[in-house]
Each structure stands twice: as C-alpha cells, then as structure tokens.
Amino acid sequence: MKKVITSGVYDILNLGHINILTEAKKLGNYLVCCVQADESVINSKKIAPILNTAERVNQIKALGFVDEVIVYDEIDQRELWGKIKPSIIVQGDDYLYSGERIEAIRYIINNKIRLILQI
C-alpha cells in the first residue's frame, strides 16, 4: 500500500486545500490528512483558529476521498510519521521555511520517504 500523508491547520477549508488533497490522493492509494489541534495552532501561530479542531476535521471528512483524518499536536511530526509509515509526504511550499526542519528532513531521507512540496 502506498500511503500519502499531508498535514496542516485547514482553518476554513478552501480551494487551495482541496486541490492539494486531491492531487495528494492521486499519488497513492491511501490518503491520511493530519489536522493540527487547536492548542498546537495557538502555541505555534500565536492565534486561535477560526474553526475548532472538530469542525476542521469534519470539513476534511466531508470531502469523501480522504481515507483517514488524524489530529496531531506536535509541530515535529516524526513520531506521527513513524506510526503511519507513509511512502510520500505532501506539504505546502511554506513547509521548509517554517520552524526548525533539519531533523524532519533527516528523518525523511533516512526513511526513504518522498517529500513533495506544493503540488
């Protein structure tokens, strides 16, 4: 099984989010969308999301083509990736420029995971 994982806040799901998720789904046969929890968003962005975690999760589920939706609260997603074991990680183009990513990139390389930025 080729698992594809993508993650984000998804605060007010928009066409850009839907396009990324649609394209990510085409890359494998199982799409996991990870939604950042409210407290984690507040801690990292210093602002609360407009929609709460449950509302954002329900929007993703309502799309009907995402196979699994997981809530995460750690900015460092290596532990999450270790549990899901994705073949491909899809991120927005801001991924490399937001926070310390050296260890995450090392993890991706060491585990032979394909990283795709901005589909």
Please annotate each region the language model reported.
Residues 1-119:
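Nucleotidyltransferase catalytic core that binds NTPs
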